[in-house]
From Swiss-Prot:
Residues spanning the signal sequence: none
UniProt source species: Pongo pygmaeus (Bornean orangutan)
First-listed, main subcellular location of the protein, grouped into a coarse class: cytoplasm
UniProt-recorded name of the protein: Myoglobin
InterPro entries: Globin, Globin-like_sf, Myoglobin
Domain Globin: 2-148
Amino acid sequence: MGLSDGEWQLVLNVWGKVEADIPSHGQEVLIRLFKGHPETLEKFDKFKHLKSEDEMKASEDLKKHGATVLTALGGILKKKGHHEAEIKPLAQSHATKHKIPVKYLEFISESIIQVLQSKHPGDFGADAQGAMNKALELFRKDMASNYKELGFQG
């Protein structure tokens, strides 16, 4: 399940492109998530009222939250699998406070892949996509493991 050094390098190379403009990447990831899986919007009291893509694009709060999400994920990815210290508090809040099911983590992972494909096709070929999928799967597996320890069946 672990990634090779080369795979981590592919992940971090494309992530460098994300970090060049985290707010717009984060906004696009959340918009894709909410459009593709409208049920996920119900977990976000701040955004429930946003019904159209135009409303979502105009929301500074959505853009800020997208940046927060991708900043946290970037911190985890940079640990190259040695991310227990970063995962624990994230799993704690997502299991006990926000009650975010693991399935929703799969949905946002799909959205991240789609955004990277559309924004960075030249830097996100098949090898990079495969590596990012593995990295996001590792993240979800470790979140799910922490959820289980916390007694959250999400």
